[in-house]
Amino acid sequence: KIMELLIFVSKITNRIFYIFELILKDELGINFKFTTDKDKFLSHEGPKLHYGDHPLENNEGLYQQSVNLLFERDITDPNVKICKHNDSKAIFPVFNEKSLFCFDIFSASFYIISRYEEYLPHVCDHYNRFQPQDSILYKMDMIEKPIINIWAKELGEIIKSKYPDIQLKKKSFKFIPTYDIDAAWSYRNKGFFRTTAAFFRDILKLDKKEIKRRFDVLTNKKMDPFDTFDYQIELQKELKIKPLYFILCGDYNTNDKNISIKNKEFQELIKHLGDYALVGIHPSFSSYLKKDVIKEEIKRLSEVLNREITISRQHFLRLCLPTSYQILSELDITDDYTMGYASQAGFRAGYADTFPFFDLENDTKTKLNIHPFALMDGTMKDYLDLDVHESFDKAKKLIDEVKNVNGTFILLWHNETLSGEKRWEGWITLYRKILDYALK
């Protein structure tokens, strides 16, 4: 018989059900059931845990003191306090010495993973994005740690030491490379007007090198520098990795400079990538919060590939909770890969694994799966201003963190980074080193 953990709570809310399921079942593999019957709980012989604001007399089982957060439905500002925990930090301190942890591990995890703080008033950056420095993890200096996985592991060890018969899940580390295709080519397939305009721009700038480079590519003397797709497929075969691709299919504008989806060569490329990998939509900058625009972009990609599109990642990582996720769900997207920051490496939701999106506005667990990424090429280059050596150290540190908790490490890269040209000099070798390190 599989051991079950009986959990006593004064009431079962959607928030409670969601976070206990995530930590106990998904992360630790522990089966459990809830009861609100105190006597049933006290007389229960097997493994048991009480979660509530004060301990019960005669409880032989485990006790975790609670704060109010999970018993509520409304989105109020809980005025989060940071406290010490072992050699690091936590939030939502509790003070009863019988409590398993000196903080409410379930409320703390829920607050972070639900992105509660992103529903509260905050100042966005110039692309309408929530800023990492406003997050509690940043203030705790824990943004580069998969903190929920770490806490869950500690909880698992405590439960196991009290109830040795409980089986914990054996998780294994996974590595998923992903590519955002914002512009498949640097010079080719840009159409007559864009190409002519670019030539005139180079002439005005007297940029002889660039004029020659463009001319050589357009006359097929040289490969287009952004055309690194053969190399990606080679890596895929050699290292037996399964990447994901997100394709920008929006209308051309300042922030969406993709190749037109009507272009035949672009369509061929998309089909070619689709033969080797799972391909998803990269909703454009200008589709932000516009359901009909995203719907049209999904339709364009779906028609090229002749299959349903179920995975997505926002261009510029523009994400507004819960609206962005509500829209994607309504458009039959099942899995989103946007969760992460542009300006900061690490774990936006404190978790290095897939989790279901909990919609705080409607107080429900949804069917949309969130896949957080830990590292993006542009973050290191443009925001943190790291060279290739520092970038490798950053990647190594994050991969080690995820390996430590047997989580999933998702890497976000772009085809142009693998050109190894101009600003991306040395980045092909860096990419290969990161892959080798993750896979060893």
Where does each model-flagged region fall?
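Catalytic domains of cell-wall/extracellular-matrix polysaccharide-remodeling enzymes
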Residues: 16, 286-365, 422-424
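Conserved hydrophobic/aromatic pocket- or pore-lining residues that grip, position, or stack substrates
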Residues: 180, 282, 328
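Generic enzyme active-site microenvironment
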Residues: 178, 280, 313
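Anion (oxyanion) recognition and catalysis
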Residues: 237, 273-274, 329, 403
